Amino acid sequence: MDRQPTAVVVGGGIAGLAAATGLAERGVAVTLVEAAPRLGGRVRAWPVQADGSATTMSRGFHAFFRQYYNLRALLRRTDPTLSRLRAVRDYPLVLAGGHTDSFAGLPTRPPLNLMAFVARSPTFTLRDLARVNADAALALLDVSFPRTYEDYAGRSAAEVLDELRFPDGARHLALEVFARSFFADPREFSGGELVAMFHTYFLGSAEGLLFDVPYDDYDTALWAPLGRHLESLGVRVVMPVKATALEDRRERVGVGLEDGATVEADVVVLATDQEPLQGLVASAEWLGNEPWRMRVAERRTAPAFAVWRLWFDRPVREGTPPFLATSGFGPLDNVSAVHRFEAGAARWARTRRGSVVELHAYALPDGTDEAALRVELRNQLRELHPEVDRATVVHEEWLVRDDCPLIGTEPWADRPEVRTPDLRVTLAGDGIRCDYPVALMERAATTGWMAANAHLARWGLRGHELWTVPMDGRHRVVPHLRRALSSSRLTLS
């Protein structure tokens, strides 16, 4: 191209930020359009007043796992040593009336990490191990992505767990928690995605299930610095304004905005949430053929989830973990002691001699009574932290959202991918298909980089490296063991 190429990135979440960064760093003139007043998408933070003091709120705690290589590459643009992330030493999982598991102190080398977890976990007994379906368990080691996604098409996470015959405690604590982290009911969530997570966190990497968190709210620690970095690269950030339409302008594409303006560019990256993406594609009848458009339109949204942040006038007990996953506590899925890791919340708690506690409830049934839900969440919190029963709530923030993509049991190949039928338009986000065993924030970042790379390749410009855990199982003996197991069954029968 004999002039500077141009791009519009629609969406200022992780996917859009990665795409904008990838394009701008190669000299592309980028306009970034974001509907909210702050960057970060579903991982943004915004200011609130808590009992007269300035503090922040977000859509809830997010774990920055060590396997999030491509997200971390994005964060290194403004924080080369990742000093704004703080390690969380443990990720305890508690089952009501029963066991607690931990991922701290495990060996780093697979499969020793998994073996050590099983050996020390109170949720596994020798009798339980004897009941485990050996072939289904070995299949977790015998993976090859993206083929494994296809192999599990039509099977839910719940069905995969049923096949494994893990003990109930381990099923709830070690695996079902994963499905609900996608805000999904395990009966609706993809079994292939569950297997991919098992590979990523246990069997395909040494980082395990320990993670980091930002030292302060998301805007302060992550996205505001990245926004300034983008502006230093010449990116024009337009917010808050929604993109409402896509226009075919011969060699270029126009993006219509709700204020009546149109931004025109050589290429467009659609890095929005799922429903805005579906609306933009529906408005652009020229984009793609009918089968592709149907694939986009048929994507489903995960059930609603609730986040309840409570500012108490008393501290929670000493030693409260920053993050606690739960199972069997009614609708309560996890509890975060926000003041244990977020600087703004910590300042508030020190000043008031109080605490800031956040409750999450995922995969809410349709028609959930929010008032009744709040009562039940508070009752379950009392079971875990009876000391707050005497505390006064001096401020609270309650939100319910239902805008996360559902990674369901449909065939993997039916999910929209980064490239569209029109070379000028790409997609990015945590609901967009890619070959790698990645998920959530890392899938958003990865597809954002991929979208940028797709356009850069057309212009003959250098793309950006992508990293992932190994795409295949790391244990060559496993396929032979599975064949031997199958042969022994045939002989016995």
Can you name each region flagged by the protein language model?
Residues 5-32:
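N-terminal Rossmann-like FAD-binding beta1-loop-alpha1 element of flavoenzymes
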Residues 15, 38, 275:
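Conserved Rossmann-like nucleotide-cofactor binding loop
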Residues 24-50:
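Glycine-rich FAD pyrophosphate-binding loop
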Residues 26, 241-357, 362-368, 384, ...:
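Mid-domain catalytic core of redox enzymes
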Residues 52-137, 146-147:
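Dinucleotide-binding Rossmann-like beta1-alpha1 core, especially the glycine-rich loop
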Residues 85-86, 236-240, 396-397, 426:
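General small-molecule cofactor/ligand-binding pocket signal
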Residues 105, 317-493:
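Conserved flavin/dinucleotide-binding core of flavoenzymes
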Residues 136-245:
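Active-site/ligand-binding neighborhood in enzyme catalytic cores
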